[in-house]
C-alpha cells in the first residue's frame, strides 16, 4: 500500500533514503504515534528513481495516476494486476514479496531478521517493556542489506 502512495518530497537526496511519515497508510502506525519509516536506497534503485523523476518529477506522487481527478496515484491493485498478467496468479501478490525478501534475506544473504523486518516497516521490536526503549534503526546494516538485495536482483537478470 505504501509503495504506490510515495511522494517525491519524502525522498531525502542528501541521505539517499525515503522518509515516510508515520501516518502513511500501510505502515500500521496510529496517527500521531511512532517515527517516520526510513528506507535506505541502493545505487541501483537511485538510478531508477532518477530516471523516473525525469519522467514524472513534476507530479506530487512517484507513481502518479493519469486519472488524477479521481485518484492522485496508482490504484493499489495495479501491481497485483500486473503480477497476475505475468502469470503468477495465486502464487504471488505484491504483499507476498515481503515473504520473499524476509526468507531470501536470511537464507541467501545471511542478514539477521531484525534488520530485514525494520527495512520492510515492521515494528515488533517496539513491543513489550524493552520495546519502549528500543529506537534502533540499524541504518548502516539496512543500507548494506538493500545494496546486497539489489545486486542479487541484478545478478539474477534484472535490467536496470
Residue locations for each model-derived region?
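C-terminal catalytic core of tyrosine-transesterase DNA break-rejoin enzymes
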Residues: 1-2, 74, 78, 85, ...
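Catalytic-site neighborhood detector that most strongly recognizes the C-terminal catalytic loop/helix
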Residues: 20-27, 46, 110, 120-158
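Active-site/catalytic core of tyrosine-dependent DNA strand-transfer enzymes
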Residues: 40-90, 100-101, 109
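Generic hydrophobic alpha-helical scaffold/packing signal
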Residues: 4, 50, 80, 103-106, ...
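Short, contiguous acidic/charged loop-to-helix segments that flank catalytic cores in large enzymes
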Residues: 23-38, 64-71, 88-96, 105-107, ...
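Active-site-proximal structural scaffolding
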Residues: 1-4, 11-13, 32-34, 42, ...
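Conserved tyrosine-mediated DNA breakage-rejoining catalytic core shared by Y-recombinases
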Residues: 4-51, 124-126
Amino acid at each position: 500500500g505504501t509503495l504506490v502512495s510515495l511522494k517525491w518530497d519524502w525522498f531525502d537526496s542528501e541521505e539517499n533514503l525515503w522518509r515516510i511519515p508515520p501516518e502513511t497508510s500501510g505502515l500500521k502506525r496510529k496517527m500521531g504515534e511512532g517515527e517516520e519509516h526510513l528506507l535506505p536506497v541502493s545505487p541501483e534503485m537511485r538510478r531508477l528513481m532518477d530516471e523516473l523523476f525525469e519522467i514524472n518529477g513534476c507530479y506530487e506522487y512517484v507513481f502518479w495516476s493519469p486519472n488524477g481527478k479521481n485518484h492522485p496515484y496508482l490504484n493499489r491493485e495495479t501491481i497485483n494486476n500486473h503480477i497476475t498478467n505475468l502469470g503468477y496468479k495465486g502464487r504471488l501478490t505484491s504483499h507476498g514479496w515481503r515473504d520473499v525478501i524476509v526468507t531470501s534475506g536470511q537464507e541467501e544473504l545471511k542478514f539477521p531478521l531484525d534488520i530485514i523486518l525494520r527495512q520492510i516497516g515492521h515494528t515488533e521490536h517496539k513491543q513489550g517493556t524493552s520495546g519502549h526503549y528500543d529506537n534502533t534503526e540499524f541504518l548502516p546494516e539496512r543500507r548494506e542489506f538493500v545494496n546486497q538485495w539489489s545486486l542479487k536482483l541484478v545478478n539474477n537478470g534484472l535490467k536496470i
